[in-house]
Amino acid sequence: MDSNSSFNNFSIVIPIYNEEDILTESINNILSICERTSVDFEIIISENGSTDNTKNLAREFEQSNPNVILIESDYPNYGEALKRGFLKCKNEMIISFDIDYYSESFLKECL
């Protein structure tokens, strides 16, 4: 896709592991940015064997928002979490970042 192309949809892949302290605020911010676009989107949360309350918080997002899809794993493996997320994407345009390092300005620029 060249820089002059437009797109009708996108997927965001976010691997997570023990992120209960930042997950709710971060996903709400990401959803808010995405919902301001006129483009269909999905957010793939690839849970990575968390031992805290991350998995339950992610399930709540999936249940309350049709644009959020949760993939669960019982063991931590960052590479596998990314791979599972990419394989689940239904859209051609894919954005991926870590929940604790994402940038709102980067996401807005991508969209």
Language-model segments: residues:
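A conserved acidic beta->alpha catalytic loop
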Residues: 47-55, 101
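Cell-envelope/extracellular polymer assembly enzymes that use nucleotide-activated donors
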Residues: 9-11, 42
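Donor nucleotide-sugar binding loop of glycosyltransferases
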Residues: 19-22, 50, 78
